Amino acid sequence: MKASELKAKTVDELKAELLSLLKAQFALRMQHATQQLAKTSELKKVRRDIARVRTVLKEKAV
């Protein structure tokens, strides 16, 4: 997900996106812990998407 796409969204949409990403991260961590996760790079992608969403939320708050 690109930062420009995130900046076009409203605060409520960003919060919903953040919640879904956090749920996805939890599911991926559980799969990784039980050795069911084939693509471990997905964890990195989700973690960085979460950081992007949080950054845009902070920018909009200022």
UniProtKB/Swiss-Prot annotation:
Keywords: Ribonucleoprotein, Ribosomal protein. CDD domains: Ribosomal_L29_HIP. InterPro entries: Ribosomal_protein_uL29, Ribosomal_uL29, Ribosomal_uL29_CS, Ribosomal_uL29_sf. GO terms for cellular component: cytosolic large ribosomal subunit. SUPFAM superfamilies: Ribosomal protein L29 (L29p) (SSF46561). HAMAP family: Ribosomal_uL29. Belongs to the universal ribosomal protein uL29 family. NCBIfam families: L29 (TIGR00012). This is Large ribosomal subunit protein uL29.
